[in-house]
Amino acid sequence: DLSHKNHYVVGLGLCMLGSICSAEMARDVAGEVEGLLSHGNSYVRKKAALTATRVIKKVPELCEGFVDAAEALLSDRHHGVLLAACTLATEMCEKDAEVQTRMRSQVPQLCKVLKSLIYAGKSAEHDIAGHADPFLQVAILRLLRVLGRGDADASDAMSDILAQIASNTDGSKNAGNAILYEAVETIIAIEAVGGLRVLAVNILGRFL
């Protein structure tokens, strides 16, 4: 099924693998899943990234084999693929400190995507309550939190975008509150400067 011409059949096979694969099966199919991360169809890339996440949960030592593909996916223009890539990268960084160190090179790219979402105009496809794809914004913030933890340089690189989110996001709707909450969690977790932490505390005060 993973080599079928119909991308929906490939997606179904990937979903099955993600749902039922054992550690032994994960090792057997890891190479095929990695290859599908660069598939020409965005639907297959998204499903492959989600399946790779499940594979890594089963066998954490397979992380290293997915790093190059995961880094490439973080520059994908398709929102669904990018969301799945953030989930994959977050899982990999939490499982392997060496992968976390290597993935820190992606912080500028992630900040660039986040900035484009913050200042994007309303889009019928991705807009929720006036916010451009809050699900993707939350996923990127969670990944930034993992990458910035314990690293001053990475934390400094993401401080500007975190300040912009904290200052400009409308918290009158649930979508905005979800983004603000993740931004606060990220600011608290990373090596943030004092002014940014004050901003986070003020947002927490509004939540109470």
What are these regions (language model features)?
Residues D1-L208:
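Extended alpha-solenoid helical-repeat scaffolds
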